[in-house]
Amino acid sequence: MRLIPLKNDQQVAKWAASYIAQRINQFKPSAERPFVLGLPTGGTPLQTYQELIKLYQAGEVSFKYVVTFNMDEYVGLAQDHPESYHSFMHNNFFKHIDIQAQNINILDGNTDDHQQECHRYEEKIKYYGKIHLFMGGVGIDGHIAFNEPASSLGSRTRIKTLTEDTLIANSRFFNNDISQVPKYALTIGVATLLDAEEIMLLITGYNKALALQAGVEGSVNHLWTVSALQLHERSIIVCDEPATQELKVKTVKYFTQLEAQEIASVC
């Protein structure tokens, strides 16, 4: 596992966006051989999307031959609802770049057959071979996508009941009214994520410090989904200084020295 400890969330966004653009450009995607990118929603990746839009506008990256798969979607929320993840992705990223509509994949939370929709999603990922780079974030309890604590580390795309902590955290998007937050979501599984060729998690803020500590220094544990990254041969966590508050000083020092060149690139 790589840990890139940066100063603040702006540096995290710049580094992550630059890394994604670099990976796409190195791949040299085409219509016959697209780059497959996994994407999250939520507050943490917003700045990264803004930085990616800037890189696109500067002509430094194109998404014409990029296929995307999103991590999750609420169940029962209309796709045009302002807080659906379809709306989030369109408004904050897709409408600002040159991605082709047919290359965008987001779970359908309004289908009558959730099991079939989840199976279809897994099969479509297999159709493309694999996800080359999956960017994600974590919740304060260490969940990735909607793989809440005690999710199986071998899980696949499925419907999940959201925990009270997640409902409370997400209520900020619903006028702080927890009763308006959908209680269920369709989500990729932990094993689906681990199938990716490379995983990059963004972890920022004091409230994510325990999750970062569990993911980096803790044992692999189904109560902390983030810890599953320890099993992946190409995983990166990009974090800011506030998120490192629960890490041992020697851990931060070790990775700061190890990743000095990467840290210098955004300072």
UniProtKB/Swiss-Prot annotation:
Q: Which GO terms describe its molecular function?
A: glucosamine-6-phosphate deaminase activity; identical protein binding
Query: Gene3D superfamilies, alphabetically?
Result: 3.40.50.1360
Per the record, the domain of life is Bacteria
Q: Which InterPro entries match?
A: Glc/Gal-6P_isomerase, Glucosamine6P_isomerase, Glucosamine6P_isomerase_CS, NagB/RpiA_transferase-like
Q: Which Pfam families match?
A: Glucosamine_iso
Question: How is this chain's activity regulated?
Answer: Allosterically activated by N-acetylglucosamine 6-phosphate (GlcNAc6P).
What PROSITE patterns does the annotation carry? GLC_GALNAC_ISOMERASE (PS01161)
- Where's the active site on this chain? D72 (proton acceptor), D141 (for ring-opening step), H143 (proton acceptor), E148 (for ring-opening step)
Catalytic reaction annotation: alpha-D-glucosamine 6-phosphate + H2O = beta-D-fructose 6-phosphate + NH4(+)
Q: Could you mention a single GO BP entry for this protein?
A: glucosamine catabolic process
Point out the gene that encodes the protein. nagB
- Protein name, please? Glucosamine-6-phosphate deaminase
Q: Which organism is it from?
A: Haemophilus ducreyi (strain 35000HP / ATCC 700724)
Q: How does it assemble?
A: Homohexamer.
Q: Where is this site: Part of the allosteric site?
A: S151, R158, K160, T161, Y254
Q: What is its EC number?
A: 3.5.99.6
Record HAMAP family: GlcN6P_deamin
SS bond list: none
Q: Which pathway does UniProt place it in?
A: Amino-sugar metabolism; N-acetylneuraminate degradation; D-fructose 6-phosphate from N-acetylneuraminate: step 5/5
Q: Which family does it belong to?
A: Belongs to the glucosamine/galactosamine-6-phosphate isomerase family. NagB subfamily.
Q: Which UniProt keywords apply?
A: Allosteric enzyme, Carbohydrate metabolism, Hydrolase
Q: Which GO terms describe its cellular component?
A: cytoplasm
The UniProt function text for this chain reads:
Catalyzes the reversible isomerization-deamination of glucosamine 6-phosphate (GlcN6P) to form fructose 6-phosphate (Fru6P) and ammonium ion.
